[in-house]
């Protein structure tokens, strides 16, 4: 969907520029009206694109999304060609007639697709949209989420001290832990929950996982049955209000510690926070979120929020070997030195992300040959077909799937850069604008909008700040390798991006009709002629 949304945003911006220019003087009023009609039709398509059925699935199917995208790209090419001709026009009636014919042809294509979409929406309303198939949460299973914590020793000590001794206030307080998916927030929170000091101070301790698709009734039942221990057979028949009252009664007068894991929105916190009474006895919450703004919103003191860091090389190594060989691990055999060397490469490739280290270690734990380890070490991305790696990607994909369409397109644009590439923020923002990703109608301050999008992506832990200026402004940024893999998978599946590397096997002649962005990351290319239909050609040679 992101590629289609980006194409529609871009063509709308191009039409808007033409309508506000002085280039239409030679055209008749009917052709100006055609442009305005095109503008309205593409606007309608963009609104329809983000529409959902009652079951939560998109109204516009993937096949139709591709068709809309191709029409939008075709229309933008023709409108830009029209602008070029109008600029060069010198009262040439033949050229003017050619411009009119182009507009007519584009309008016919758009009308066909728009009519089809409108018919589809009507049918969906009649049928009330089939409910989406139920699916299990893509968080990793118990084997990968095993409660093993390497590193963060100082952070744990400070957190326990903060929760048990507090700030001096007797009021109920919230401390937040924020960071990118897979960085270890949930495991960190588990170690805090089971810490002996926490057990001594808080009589009632509990855990609820909110997630992005939370069910208030289920959360209340978990609190009643597993935390407060006062659930009974009548709970299932109670409405949410009655269940909330029972939770409040059960916690009244108690000193409790509750972990609220994986919360996605301020609204979610507002909906559950009133369940917990403030009895003036220093009750505490530990809240985890991948969205920094959500964490700071809920925190009693936002400045005390813990931003999870990547593991150091030593911490990564300990976690890796623990996962590969077990708790009392040791490496034996004649190839011990070689295995350690290869293991070091694997650890380095995981860039300090615990979820990635755990997933890769889970794969290597079943491999006993040195050459198998060496194959994995060459590139972590070579594991893309492995089930554990796919599970790992599904976890981080949750953040991407919940982005607005505009932010999705901007996030996917990171894929044009090589892995671990540090990107100038100024350059990135200008590229987004040049690509038409920020061409919002009625918005003139494109750079401000782009900066806000980047800030939101950073706040949602999808983008890492690499360097700041002396006044605190972000100078450079990058994305984690795991997110880069996600970018590539999503962008290529939507025919938005193709990266031409030295090992690329696709025929050059196949590229010009299929991809919007071509990123050349190899010295071995011979011609640009075949890329003429691609909107953008990036030559990024990091050799």
Question: What do these predicted regions represent?
Answer:
Residues 1-26:
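Membrane-inserting effector segments that mediate pore formation, membrane fusion
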Residues 258-260:
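Hydrophobic residues in beta-strands of the RecA-like P-loop NTPase core, especially within AAA+ ATPase
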Residues 19-89, 103, 110:
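Extended, amphipathic alpha-helical segments that serve as helical scaffolds
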Residues 79, 84-89, 98, 277-279, ...:
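Surface-exposed helical/coil interface segments that assemble multiprotein signaling complexes
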Residues 112, 116-183, 187-196, 200-203, ...:
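N-terminal flanking helix/linker immediately upstream of nucleotide/cofactor-binding cores
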Residues 78, 85, 89-131:
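Alpha-helical bundle protein-protein interaction modules that mediate dimerization/oligomerization
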Residues 4-7, 44, 49-52, 56-59, ...:
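Leucine-rich repeat
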Residues 12, 18-21, 36-58, 223-237, ...:
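Non-catalytic, charged helical/coil tracts that couple and regulate nucleotide-powered enzyme cores
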């Amino acid at each position: 969907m992101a590629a289609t949304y980006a194409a529609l945003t871009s063509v709308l911006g191009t039409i808007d520029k033409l309508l506000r220019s002085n280039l239409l003087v030679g055209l008749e009023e009917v052709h100006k009206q055609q442009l305005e009609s095109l503008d309205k039709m593409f606007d309608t398509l963009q609104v329809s694109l983000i529409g959902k059925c009652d079951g939560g699935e998109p109204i516009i199917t993937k096949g139709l999304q591709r068709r809309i995208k191709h029409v939008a790209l075709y229309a933008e090419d023709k409108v830009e060609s029209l602008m070029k001709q109008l600029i060069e026009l010198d009262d040439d009636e033949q050229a003017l007639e050619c411009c009119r014919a182009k507009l007519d042809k584009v309008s016919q294509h758009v009308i066909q697709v728009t009519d089809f979409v409108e018919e589809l929406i009507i049918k969906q309303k009649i049928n009330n949209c089939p409910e989406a198939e139920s699916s299990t949460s893509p968080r990793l299973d118990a084997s990968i989420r095993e409660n093993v914590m390497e590193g963060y020793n100082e952070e744990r000590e400070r957190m326990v001290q903060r929760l048990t001794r507090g700030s001096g206030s007797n009021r109920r307080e919230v401390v937040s832990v924020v960071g990118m998916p897979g960085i270890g927030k949930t495991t960190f929170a588990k170690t805090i929950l089971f810490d002996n000091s926490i057990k001594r101070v808080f009589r009632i301790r509990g855990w609820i996982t909110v997630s992005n698709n939370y069910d208030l009734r289920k959360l209340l039942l978990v609190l009643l049955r597993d935390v407060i221990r006062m659930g009974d057979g009548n709970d299932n028949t109670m409405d949410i209000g009655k269940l909330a009252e029972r939770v409040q009664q059960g916690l009244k007068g108690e000193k409790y510690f509750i972990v609220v894991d994986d919360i996605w929105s301020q609204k979610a916190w507002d909906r559950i926070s009133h369940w917990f009474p403030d009895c003036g006895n220093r009750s505490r919450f530990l809240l985890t979120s991948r969205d920094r703004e959500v964490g700071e919103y809920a925190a009693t003191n936002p400045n005390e929020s813990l931003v999870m860091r990547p593991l150091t090389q030593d911490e990564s190594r300990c976690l890796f070997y623990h996962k590969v060989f077990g708790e009392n691990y040791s490496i034996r055999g004649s190839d011990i030195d070689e295995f350690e060397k290869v293991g070091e490469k694997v650890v380095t490739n995981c860039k300090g992300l615990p979820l990635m280290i755990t997933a890769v270690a889970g794969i290597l734990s079943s491999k006993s040959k040195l050459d198998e380890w060496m194959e994995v070490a060459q590139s972590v991305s070579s594991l893309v077909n492995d089930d554990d790696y796919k599970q790992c990607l599904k976890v981080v994909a949750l953040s991407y799937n919940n982005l607005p369409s505009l932010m999705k397109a901007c996030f996917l644009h990171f894929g044009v850069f090589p892995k671990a590439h540090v990107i100038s923020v100024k350059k990135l923002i200008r590229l987004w604008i040049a690509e038409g990703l920020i061409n919002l109608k009625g918005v003139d301050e494109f750079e401000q909008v782009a900066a806000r999008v980047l800030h939101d992506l950073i706040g949602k832990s999808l983008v890492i700040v690499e360097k700041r200026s002396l006044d605190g402004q972000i100078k450079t940024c990058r994305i984690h390798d795991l997110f880069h893999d996600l970018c590539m998978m999503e962008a290529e599946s939507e025919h938005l991006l193709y990266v031409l590397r030295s090992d690329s096997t696709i025929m050059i002649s196949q590229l010009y009709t299929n991809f919007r962005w071509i990123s050349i990351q190899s010295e071995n290319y011979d011609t640009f002629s075949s890329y003429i239909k691609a909107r953008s050609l990036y030559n990024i040679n990091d050799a």
